[in-house]
Amino acid sequence: MVEELPSVFLVGPMGAGKTTIGRLLAKQLGRSFVDSDWYIESQTGADIAWIFAKEGEAGFRERETRAIDELTQQPQIVLATGGGAVMAAENREYLKQRGIVIYLNAPVDVQMARTAKDKSRPLLQQPNPRKILQGLYSARDPLYREVAHIIMPTGHTYPRHMVNQLLQQLNSFCISTSVDSEPEKD
């Protein structure tokens, strides 16, 4: 199954566990793991907060779209996208058409707990981060669902257990997809 599995792309809000789950999943699948934010940082030589400060969110999103385009063309990788990657229609198309998209769905309380002390998230450097997270979740959840082939709730189980569940779902997804694409026999 693993050899036939296309690239796997993780989407979801900040704090959903995309990087943690992505690393573990890549290890289990014997694949390379790439985090799109880290990729952007390595390409620019600057961290995301600096890019936001100098170029604004629009400048960052342009860089993100170029990165998503490049990364989704790589064969058999596990990619963790930034939380806002789904905001651009181009990115949603790249993700949906070039691999299997897994939406790691984390409730706002889980996001708050995981991001509370993280100063590297520019969108949360506001007086009321909970309100920001709630607004982002409301705006982005339908877009995550639009691109997702698999939806996995996060925050209530250990990462290794979640990866085992994902492997089962990926196996089921691949089996059902191959059955659906086989020509009918007379």
From Swiss-Prot:
Pathway: Metabolic intermediate biosynthesis; chorismate biosynthesis; chorismate from D-erythrose 4-phosphate and phosphoenolpyruvate: step 5/7. One of its GO terms (molecular function) is shikimate kinase activity. GO terms for biological process: amino acid biosynthetic process; aromatic amino acid family biosynthetic process; chorismate biosynthetic process. Its EC number is 2.7.1.71. It is found in: Cytoplasm. Keywords: Amino-acid biosynthesis, Aromatic amino acid biosynthesis, ATP-binding, Cytoplasm, Kinase, Magnesium, Metal-binding, Nucleotide-binding, Transferase. Monomer. Belongs to the shikimate kinase family. This is Shikimate kinase.
